[in-house]
Amino acid sequence: MESKSYTWFERRRRTKALDLAQEQITKALDTVTLLHQATKKMAENKRKEAMQYIENIFKVEKEVDKLRTEVFKELSKGVALFAEYREDLMHLVKRLDTLADHVKDAARCIKMLGDAEIPKEFWENTAHTTSFLVDCAHALRGSIEKIAVDSVAAIEGAKKVEDIERKIDDEYLKTKALFIKHGREVDSGSMVIFDDLVEFIEHAADMCADTADYIVILASRE
């Protein structure tokens, strides 16, 4: 997984809170890549490999939670940053933590569906959707990096996130349509869980877009 240095943070006085926040944001976005790899492996019927990615998601998400707690602990000391930037940092950390939560919930659904008989088209569509989610996360990562050094680029990156999120909305509807096409081939329990999987991926995309909206606000201040 790649590790980035967010220039917006570099312009502030180096603190433990900023170091922890950078790591938390990076790991939260990394969970999206792991989810895509898991859905790809399910589409290829490589279930054992898919489950390895799922376990990695659970591991990374726990690290994200731990880092969030440590960031808030540092920020509560009151001297980590000026109040305005402390608030900005908390909002970013909360949003990315929620994103990782949605990815974890999607991963749980995949784990439950590990032995279920699911049409290949379901997994192929889902893998296609998560590929867009990876694009969304990469655009979000780039936008965060540009907040301080190039506010125009940061805003453009945020708009790119929203454009990709709309594509995910389209894929969401296509996948839902498969429920009708293959309804008689899938047992009701598996269908309910797959529906949850699709919803959690959509929630993750929505959180990317929500974070992008907040980045526009931050970049406009710079």
Feature annotation, model-predicted:
Residues 1-222:
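Cytosolic, long alpha-helical scaffolding segments
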